[in-house]
Design a protein with these regions (language model features):
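Fungal secretory targeting signals
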Residues: 1-27
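Short mixed-charge
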Residues: 273-283
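Residues that scaffold, gate, or flank divalent-cation-dependent active/transport sites
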Residues: 327
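Chitinase-like catalytic core of GlcNAc-active glycosidases
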Residues: 24-271, 286-307, 320, 333-342
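Short, solvent-exposed mixed-charge patches
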Residues: 345-346
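Catalytic cores of alpha/beta
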Residues: 309-316
Length: 346
């Protein structure tokens, strides 16, 4: 042991000389970078999976991929939703390698690298399996206090609200339920502690939005007061309503099958015109809409072929803010046909 230590002491000056002789070949990646703010142009927004969807057999051969993979911007994606943090029953948010099976998160430096290459990166909250208990204020407060340090450390540019359970309406759109109040508490609590250009998007399923044209209460239309608040006060960057995994609705309670151009247009026009529920109008103009579609067959019910996606987009002639898709990894597993089709049409 003593000999090894002596030898290392002799080698240290030599190593220092070698390292100092070629500084141009050694560079440390920055692990902090500024919040980017809302993209001024069109967006193609995709979910980045922090787990391995090839290893678990969902969408081989393209599983986990680095968030800074140059293929992502090459195929048109300029907004990335990093999915999903683990949320413990008490509201504690976790974002770290191994927080769930086969999960690996991007480092702060890798986040900065992706952002330098053009990406705006949001943390997506919720999803089908990462629920937040919205019935308790203490849980909401714990959520805020634990997510804000993560958002700052990892250089996120915003949050995406993708909560798919636990949010219900009171039956009176002018009276918030406990779960609606606590979701607003979470959003306000996060935004208050982040830079003023920190972003907010939402990706509700159709029942939570245009489903309110059928009836308001329970899950039906339960996102509407939240959407209205942040659309009206200017903090909502845009809405990514999921045009899949269920029927779609127009302003008059009319119903359309997912995966149809007719349904795409009916929902989009309804929000642009303004959905009136119990005398309250909720309006999301075209330039604050980036509807969500499955990237590939199997990614979600209501898949639209590239031809149908093109028809839906071309109908609006560039009026929409963009499109969202589930997911980047799914698209990569089938030759990036979604991104390649959309990027030239926005």
């Amino acid at each position: 042991m003593t000999r090894l230590l002596d030898a290392s002491l002799v080698l240290l000056p030599m190593l220092s000389t070698l390292v100092g002789a070629a500084p141009a070949t050694v560079s440390a990646r920055a692990d902090t970078c500024a919040t980017k703010g809302k993209p001024s142009g069109k967006v193609l927004q995709g979910y980045w999976e922090n787990w391995d969807g090839a290893k678990n057999g969902v969408h081989p051969p393209f599983g986990w991929t680095p968030i800074q993979n140059p293929a992502i911007p090459q195929h048109g994606y300029n907004v990335i939703n990093a999915a999903f943090p683990v949320i413990l029953p008490d509201g504690t948010v976790k974002w770290e390698d191994g927080m769930d099976r086969d999960v690996k998160v991007a480092t702060p430096a890798e986040m900065c690298e992706a952002k330098a290459a053009g990406a705006t990166i949001l943390m997506s909250i919720g999803g089908a399996t990462a629920a937040v208990d919205l019935s308790q204020t203490a849980v909401a407060d714990k959520f805020i206090s634990t997510i804000v340090p993560i958002l700052k450390k990892y250089n996120f540019d915003g949050i995406d609200i993708d909560i798919e359970s636990g949010l219900t309406g009171s039956g009176n759109i002018n009276q918030l339920s406990t779960s609606q109040s606590n979701l607003i508490r979470i959003i306000d609590g996060v935004l208050a502690q982040m830079p003023s250009n920190f972003g907010l998007t939402m990706a509700p399923e159709t029942a939570y939005v245009t489903g309110g044209s059928v009836v308001y209460g329970s899950i039906w239309g339960s996102y509407l007061p939240i959407i209205k608040k942040y659309a009206d006060n200017g903090r909502l960057w845009w809405l990514n309503m999921q045009y899949y995994n269920g029927d779609m609705y127009g302003c008059s309670g009319d119903s359309y099958k997912a995966g149809t151009v007719e349904g795409f247009i009916a929902q989009t026009d309804c929000l642009n015109k303004g959905l009136v529920v119990q005398g309250t109008t909720i309006r999301v103009p075209y330039d604050k809409q980036a509807p969500g579609l499955p990237a590939q067959q199997g990614a979600g019910g209501g898949y639209m072929s590239p031809s149908l996606v093109g028809q839906a987009l071309d109908h609006y002639g560039g009026k929409l803010k963009g499109l969202m898709t589930w997911s980047i990894n799914w698209d990569g597993s089938k030759g990036w046909t979604f991104g390649d089709n959309v990027k030239g049409r926005l």
